[in-house]
Amino acid sequence: IDVSGVSKSFASKSSRPIHALSDISFSIAQGEIVGLLGTNGAGKTTLFDLILGLTTPTSGNISVLGHTPHAAIRAAQIGAVLQTGGLLPELTVQDTLKMISSTFPHPLPIGEVAKQADLDRILHRPVGKCSGGEQQRVRFALAILGNPQILLLDEPTAGMDAQARHEFWSTMHRQADQGRTIVFATHYLEEADNFAERIILLHEGKLRADAKATELREHSGKRIVEAKFDGTPLNAKELPTVAEISLSGGYARMTTSDSDVLAKFLLNHTSAHDLTIRKHSLEDAFLALTASQS
């Protein structure tokens, strides 16, 4: 997937257009697993719509496997699980797969798709009787029926419980092992941290970061020191090193570039106990990057 200088604007009731995306550029190689992150309104869904050919850029270009998005869709080179798009509740899972299978030039066997999506046991169940997680697996099965090289997943685990999310990502790992390119948007940062090889972060329609999750966590070069305190509240002016402090009752969370010096001081000169030092999580990096660019 090659996205070059892409911007997308929409008309609004006011005189000013809404700029959903502004000069976005990146490339995704075959076989990569990429997590697309961003706050609400960051432009994630708009970007997916552009890659799928559901809308066109105001400026810039997008190519998919060397073709236009429309050509890639016609050749069944892209499969997608989107937030929108209903299923027919009265049809069984098997009949749904058969109906959509007939629209592809070279579909995968329905039995193989059902096995990959873990639908074997519910093929004869009406879709309307399926749970939310089961319906999402049906959508995933429809996405891979055409044997695509690329999978786009827009909030694929929204509405799933923890067990259903775990099962879904186990299925995605198997898809990745087959060499498919997987691009997914999620608001579960833990999912992106665990599954994505690379993170693309959008904020207010602009590209804020494009790196491995480990690189994003190391973005600030700082560490987080957390501790509980008895008695006198912590006084930031007494600390031997600069730290950003968040206090809540007898608990303090401090971000600093010199965690060893800070920890030694806290343990020797304050009532601190249950002290921990950790690196930034992906969530910490996400909050820092979106806050600093607002």
Residues of each region from the PLM?
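Conserved ABC ATPase "signature" region
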Residues: 98, 102, 108-123
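ABC transporter nucleotide-binding domain
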Residues: 170-256
